[in-house]
From Swiss-Prot:
Polar residues composition-biased segments: 430-447, 485-494
Positions contributing to [4Fe-4S] cluster 1 binding: C20, C61, C64, C67
Entry keyword set: 4Fe-4S, Iron, Iron-sulfur, Metal-binding
Annotated GO MF terms: 4 iron, 4 sulfur cluster binding; iron-sulfur cluster binding; metal ion binding
Protein name per the record: Cytosolic Fe-S cluster assembly factor nar1
Record GO biological process: iron-sulfur cluster assembly
Classification lineage: Eukaryota, Fungi, Dikarya, Ascomycota, Pezizomycotina
Length: 597
């Protein structure tokens, strides 16, 4: 298991109060034979029991409610900074030549070569975490990551082959594609008749959070028809990179190794899903083959620091400036190159939130289609529950949506959406009058209990309280203090005094600083803002054009490239295993690259 994942991390930064929804089970103590059962003991003589320490494993707590089986925990442990180093030292880098232009990248590699194309994708929440840790801007954090992954002073400075990453992609780019498709999905669900159930049921629930998906698949299968069918930005980025590069370079997807740097550990689970492999979008193979993951490895913000320390690289000492364009070969398609690496606004604002802005984009898209309409916001029982209503100029509600962050709030949402279950004893009879009255009462109760949930058109659901900037893999305030201490030692200055465990107030203040860094991405950019920013409608139209070009380039329908599926899974947590043991199941899962979901 990744050494950075410890019991202290499993609260997923739910502070100041940590409430585990999985009870800790203890066995009754064996009674001492030396005690007299008839002896009366006074209270002041009762000695406190020395209970064994509670053992909370990844099986218990990652994604909560026993969503992760012990076999899947092993699959997660395979994705760590050690795997990154081992892979970089196991294969030479695929050599690319950009002498002939963007659409015709030449290479001297042979088809049977063992070389690999190393590509990486980085989420904006990771950049915000590093920016806060080292006291730099979000843009400088991106330069730091680029220098580390691809520069001569980073990973290329060491290792067996001096390998680095050929391309480093911002997941914000594919997030914009997911946003445009999400708005289409919601609009179609409101206006289209869907007898074949190709569209999710209303309310549509966002599906970008793997912890939430894991929870729904294993505990509430009745939720699955409501889940958005779209891939997450991480998954969609992996599909694009593997599909385009394998075709353009004439190599198998197995020779393209994709590293994703994400804010939470649950993204490792997402990368292990068998639905997110080349078997979902690639041509039907003539011979049986092992599916290839779209994302080979996921590490978190903290694991990125561990990766640098393992190579003896000081991240803050790297140049905080962009790498020259000569370090990167142009992406092997001109349209996709300009789309993936263009300099434009990220749209990371306080209004859109810290988790990608899915709900905000849906609201602004419908608002743009209804001139004069206004978005009315109403806070729920806490800051992580917010309801939104798009009101027409005449005061009529056009669209209702909501945001639910954190598992406690998610459970409340699930209860609202749970279908009613008639309670009737077998063989019992009711008169027509009483039966009709009971039905009316049941219908009224159902309407009262479910009305606040089922009338939503869209709900943005995230497992972490506060959103993705508060992911379990983000750099903690303790880690930042340790990094500052190490920098003081390197610069031979007096290190800061050792601090006690941060208080809840300090943790909230730290998260607020990370949020501020996340929202300041556009202000940190050196690209001058246009005087007339593109409208939501025109920007979505541009993205649809790029997605259509990708589909035509690959000759694969967009429905296979951008969409995925879910299925009910029975959890084995807390159950007596009568079948194969965990070791056998791990071998089976690993051979299927992410089965077991």
């Amino acid at each position: 298991m990744s050494a950075i994942l410890s019991a202290d991390d499993l609260n997923d930064f739910i502070s100041p109060g940590v409430a585990c929804i999985k009870p800790v089970e203890t066995l009754p103590q064996k009674e001492s034979q030396s005690e007299n059962p008839y002896e009366v003991t006074k209270e002041d003589k009762i000695q406190p029991e020395n209970l064994p320490p509670a053992q909370i494993s990844l099986t218990d707590c990652l994604a909560c409610s026993g969503c992760v089986t012990s076999a899947e925990a092993v699959l997660i442990s395979l994705q760590s900074h050690a795997e990154v180093l081992n892979t970089l030292d196991a294969y030479p880098e695929f050599r690319l030549s950009n002498e002939s232009g963007q659409d015709d990248i030449k290479t001297t590699e042979t088809a049977d070569s063992e070389s690999r194309v190393f590509v990486a994708s980085v989420s904006p929440q990771v950049r915000a975490s590093l920016a806060t840790t080292y006291g730099i801007s979000e843009r400088e954090a991106q330069c730091m990551i680029d220098q580390f992954l691809s520069g001569s002073q980073g990973l290329r400075a060491g290792g067996k082959f001096h390998n680095g990453f050929a391309w480093v992609v911002d997941t914000n780019t594919m997030r914009e594609a997911v946003l445009a498709l999400t708005a289409d999905e919601v609009a179609n669900s409101l206006t289209s008749i869907d007898p074949l159930n190709t569209l999710p049921k209303r309310p549509i629930l966002s599906s970008a959070c793997p912890g939430w998906i894991c929870y729904a698949e294993k505990t509430h299968p009745f939720i699955l028809p409501h889940l958005s069918r779209l891939k997450s930005p991480q998954a969609l980025t992996g599909t694009l990179l593997k599909s385009v590069l394998s075709k353009a370079l004439g190599i198998s997807p197995t020779r393209i190794w994709h590293l994703a740097i994400m804010p939470c550990f649950d993204k490792k689970l997402e990368a292990s899903r068998e639905e997110l492999t080349d078997s979902a979008w690639g041509p039907t193979p003539s011979e049986p083959h092992t599916p290839v993951r779209d994302v080979d490895c996921v590490i978190t913000s903290r694991e990125l620091l561990t990766l640098a320390a393992s190579r003896g690289i000081s991240l803050p000492r790297l140049p905080l400036k962009p790498l020259p364009r000569s370090y990167y070969s142009p992406f092997p398609d001109r349209s996709l190159d300009s789309f993936l690496f263009s300099k434009r606004s990220s749209g990371q604002t306080a209004a859109s939130g810290t988790s990608g802005g899915y709900l905000h984009h849906v609201l602004t898209t419908f608002q743009a289609k209804n001139p004069g309409s206004q978005i009315v916001t109403q806070r729920g029982r806490n800051a992580d529950v917010v309801e939104y209503v798009l009101m027409s100029p005449g005061g009529e509600p056009l669209l209702k949506a909501a945001r639910y962050y954190g598992f406690r709030n998610i459970q409340n949402l699930v209860r609202k959406l749970k279908p009613a279950r008639a309670s009737r004893l077998p063989g019992a009879r009711q008169s027509a009058t009483s039966a009709g009255g009971s039905r009316r009462q049941l219908a009224s109760r159902n309407a009262a209990s479910a009305g606040s949930g089922t009338d939503y058109a869209y709900v943005e659901v995230m497992a972490c309280p506060g959103g993705c900037t508060n992911g379990g893999g983000q750099v903690r305030i303790e880690d930042a203090r340790e990094a500052a201490s190490n920098m003081s030692v390197e610069s031979q200055t007096e290190p800061p005094e050792a601090a006690l465990k941060p208080t809840p107030h300090e943790q909230r203040a730290w998260l607020a600083r990370v949020d501020e860094a996340y929202y300041s991405a556009d202000s940190d950019s050196e690209v001058p803002a246009t005087s007339e920013p593109a409208s939501v409608i025109s920007r979505d139209a541009e993205i649809h054009g790029v997605l259509q070009h990708w589909s035509e380039y690959m000759n694969i329908p967009l429905s296979k490239l951008a969409y995925t599926s879910y299925r009910e899974v029975e959890s084995d947590v807390g159950k007596t295993q009568t079948g194969p043991n965990d070791t056998a199941r791990v071998v089976e899962l690993a051979s299927k690259i992410g089965g077991g979901w």
